[in-house]
Amino acid sequence: MRLILLSGLLLLGIFLANGHEQDPDGKLLNSLIDALMHLQREFAKLRGAFLTVYKARSFGNGSERLYVTNKEIKNFEALRQICEQAGGHIPSPQLENQNKAFANVLERHNKEAYLVVGDSANFTNWAAGEPNKAAGACVKADTHGSWHSTSCDDNLLVVCEFYFIL
């Protein structure tokens, strides 16, 4: 949308630089100004709609991160590729409310899903006896949001994490 606005400004600049020989009444200039104003209004509406959805989603799950599933069942490497192609990430809850939002998706689908735990994580939600490196190098969350060590070859629910930078 910003590209369209910039294009409109560029056309307006070119028109002004070339003079008014081809548009002595200013109709073309007025038309460009009207089109630019229309694009600005549309951009403001889209931005407002986006922010409304963002705020509603954040309010609804208590997290500014959005956890979404495509309902596929895949292993860790396939999940990584799917999330990357979708513009998201493998879930990595950093706070309790983020883990709860993630767990809500798992509970709704009655499935487990992979997550990534950073080395410097301030928040963890390991189940009793975990982490258990013997169980595998990956981590999964159960439907209650508890974390368990698991094999990276297990086929689990595909859930990707998306977050907004405002």
UniProtKB/Swiss-Prot annotation:
Q: Which residues are glycosylated?
A: N61, N122
Name the job this protein performs.
This phospholipase A2 inhibitor binds directly phospholipase A2 in the presence or absence of calcium.
For this entry, the protein name equals Phospholipase A2 inhibitor
Sequence ranges assigned to domain C-type lectin in this UniProt record: 46-161
Say yes or no: keyword Glycoprotein present. yes
Q: Which InterPro entries match?
A: C-type_lectin-like, C-type_lectin-like/link_sf, C-type_lectin_CS, CTDL_fold
Name the Gene3D superfamilies for this protein. Mannose-Binding Protein A, subunit A (3.10.100.10)
Location(s), subcellular: Secreted
PROSITE patterns recorded: C_TYPE_LECTIN_1, C_TYPE_LECTIN_2
Main location per the UniProt record: secreted
Q: In which tissues is it expressed?
A: Expressed by the liver.
Q: Which UniProt keywords apply?
A: Calcium, Disulfide bond, Glycoprotein, Lectin, Phospholipase A2 inhibitor, Secreted, Signal
* Family under the similarity heading: Belongs to the alpha-type phospholipase A2 inhibitor family.
Give the disulfide map. Answer: C83-C160, C138-C152
User: Which source organism?
Assistant: Bothrops alternatus (Urutu)
Named from the GO MF annotations, one term is:
carbohydrate binding
Question: Quaternary arrangement and interactors, per the entry?
Answer: Homotrimer; non-covalently linked.
Residue spans crossing the bilayer: none
Keyword Methyltransferase applies:
no
